[in-house]
Amino acid sequence: MKTGIVSAVLALVMPVCVYATTLRLSTDIDLLVLDGKKVSSSLLRGADSIELDNGPHQIVFRIEKNIRLSNHEQRLYISPPLVVSFNTQKISQVNFNLPRLENEQESEAFEAAPRIELLDGDAMPIPVKLDILALTKTPKGTDYEADTERYNKAGKSASLPGFATMMADDSTLLSGVSELDVIPPQSQTLTEQRLKFWFQQADPETRTRFLQWAKQQPSS
């Protein structure tokens, strides 16, 4: 049932439109933030795609890939966090198209001038805005969600201010807890709070679909 709750929250956090878009995940991509919300790795474990609504989106991610060194050994290359904004209007599928990253020279060139493509289901390029997310170090470590909020409020090249506002409002409602993850039993009150809030925000059609889905779920 806890997994079902997370699926419900994911479905309700995003506006629902007539069209839906499938974001295909790459094994070389570590997705950090989606539309202003931190995405937990445990939530994505084993998933090869995410369903998005039709409209503007923003993702923050890193590329993690083994590259060859000059001595023929390998090491894990981790890129800086990248911000990509795009619009999926009337697009049914989004695929990552990453540049070649096989050795130190190619990874260094990518660090100097990052570039990625997003392709639709017909392998046609989707217009994107790409930038590097500046990170703020804190005693608690890196907070990608907070850094994304600051980025969006700063009016940068790939900023989407609407997601910064949505994130701030949701964080206040949820007492600062906004990581989309499987919620432990002791936090069921928070789960209920989330579900009630997003249910109230949804349109009648979305509420009906959610209630139909909930009736089909096991009680425990």
From Swiss-Prot:
The protein's name in its UniProt record: UPF0319 protein Ent638_1476
InterPro entries: UPF0319
DNA-binding in keyword set: no
Signal sequence bounds: 1-20
UniProt keyword annotation of Signal present: yes
Family listed: Belongs to the UPF0319 family.
Species of provenance: Enterobacter sp. (strain 638)
Lineage of the species this protein comes from: Bacteria, Pseudomonadati, Pseudomonadota, Gammaproteobacteria, Enterobacterales
Keyword list, A-Z: Signal
